[in-house]
Regions:
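Transmembrane helix interruption/hinge and helix-loop junction motifs
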Residues: 53-57, 119-127, 261-264, 327-332
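Juxtamembrane intracellular "pre-TM" segments in multi-pass secondary transporters
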Residues: 147-181
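Helix-loop junctions on the cytosolic side of multi-pass membrane transporters
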Residues: 54, 81, 85, 127-157, ...
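Substrate-agnostic recognition of the 12-TM MFS/MFS-like secondary transporter fold
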Residues: 5-44, 60-119, 129, 134, ...
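C-terminal ends and interior cores of transmembrane alpha-helices
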Residues: 38-55, 249-262
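Alpha-helical transmembrane segments of multipass membrane proteins
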Residues: 45-49, 112-116, 138, 255-258, ...
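Membrane-water interface of transmembrane alpha-helices in multipass transporters/channels
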Residues: 55, 59, 126-131, 209-213
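C-terminal transmembrane bundle of multi-pass solute transporters/carriers
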Residues: 15-18, 26, 32, 164, ...
């Protein structure tokens, strides 16, 4: 059920991603973020009302998750595409690290606060906190000036042509193409395996639901540490090499998790934290790399393409991971996925066009 809920929240975003990217590069990015946040809040408000009048069904939840995904398809690329218009180029990776800190804090505090509030109030009232948060975000954007990239005057604009241009920006750059390919391949294994973490706690380590929740929080704590490392200063390092090292580190944590004994829950928690660190460092390095190497006027399309290309194979993995875990077992699934991610990381180091990308002058 969790896998299908995740698919409901990802499928619309992946389908319309290339279209939204072209629109983001065409429209006012500040307004896009404000409207997207408002739309997402409206979906949550409708769900709260359905619970309040006691008619909420599973299909309502899945449908509204899908609608929220449409809002996210606009919001996330617009936000990432706006950062280079506000910050110096040499600070972009550091800012991406700070964003990882913010995301990690919300991932740690959000579930904990939600679990506490659900014991006090009904779910419809708890959902209103999400609505209130969106209203605060939209209001704060009123006071922020976000410039839009310069557009060529007198040029006929065609959305399909702009989508093709976004794809060609990636394909024409061999280094960027390889990095995208490796990222898509890794996402195919990382995102589905993340669904198995609670099952590892409950079924393999014979843990409790509380311990399963702790593991989810520990990943976010690791991501918080990784974000803090990347946000602390500007590092003079090849970001492509850093991304590849994080592939190896993340794959190793999955592989070692698969060989742990049933009484190795503490080590599972340690490996989960390290995996969280690797994920945050990777995300900060990758985001900063794209923001540095791509013109601001095309970033909406490139980020949308990236999200789409990453999410589609990840969803295929989500569909198949249950069958894989049932057929091979939980630990074998971790060992297999971790080993493949390590192989991808090694292959990435042996790809000269990708390794040269962050050495090239902008």
């Amino acid at each position: 059920m969790l896998a299908w809920a995740a698919i409901a929240g990802l499928l619309p975003q992946s389908i319309i991603g290339p279209f939204t990217g072209a629109l983001i590069d065409r429209w006012n990015r500040k307004r896009i973020m404000m409207l997207a946040d408002t739309f997402i809040a409206l979906c949550t408000l409708i769900l709260a009302i359905l619970f309040w009048i006691d008619i909420a069904q599973v299909w309502h939840i899945f449908g509204l998750l899908a609608l929220r995904s449409i809002g996210s398809a606009f919001h996330m690329p617009a936000m990432q595409a706006s950062v280079p218009l506000l910050a110096p180029t040499d600070q972009l990776t550091r800012i991406a690290g700070v964003n990882q800190i913010i995301a990690s804090v919300s991932q740690i505090a959000g579930p904990a606060l939600g679990a506490m509030l659900i014991t006090i109030w009904k779910i419809e009232y708890v959902l209103l906190f999400d609505v209130a948060g969106a209203l605060i975000a939209v209001t704060s954007l009123f006071f922020v000036h976000i410039p839009n990239p310069e557009k060529e005057e007198g040029v006929e604009r065609d959305i399909l042509k702009e989508m093709k241009e976004g794809a060609m920006i990636i394909l024409r750059n061999k280094g960027l193409s390889w990095i995208f390919l490796y990222d898509i391949s890794v996402a195919f294994f990382i995102i589905p395996i993340s669904v198995l973490f609670p099952l590892m706690t409950l079924d393999y380590f014979n843990g409790t639901e509380f311990q399963a929740g702790i593991i989810e929080a520990i990943w976010s704590v690791g991501a918080l540490i990784g974000g803090a490392i990347m946000g602390a200063k500007v590092y003079k390092i090849n970001r492509v090499a850093l991304i590849n090292w994080m592939y190896l580190l993340c794959g190793l944590t999955f592989l070692l998790t698969g060989v742990l004994p049933t009484d190795g829950f503490v080590w599972f928690a340690v490996l989960t934290a390290i995996g969280g660190v690797s994920g945050a460092v990777y995300n900060a390095a990758f985001t900063g790399l794209l923001q540095t190497k791509i013109e601001p006027g095309a970033l909406g399309r490139v980020f949308s393409m990236f999200f789409t290309f990453s999410l589609i194979p990840a969803m295929l993995g989500l569909v198949g991971i249950g069958f894989l875990a049932d057929g091979l077992g939980l630990t074998t699934s971790f060992i297999l996925s971790g080993s493949i991610i390590i192989v991808i990381g090694i292959a990435a180091f042996l790809t000269p066009p990708a390794m040269r990308l962050d050495r090239q002058k902008d």
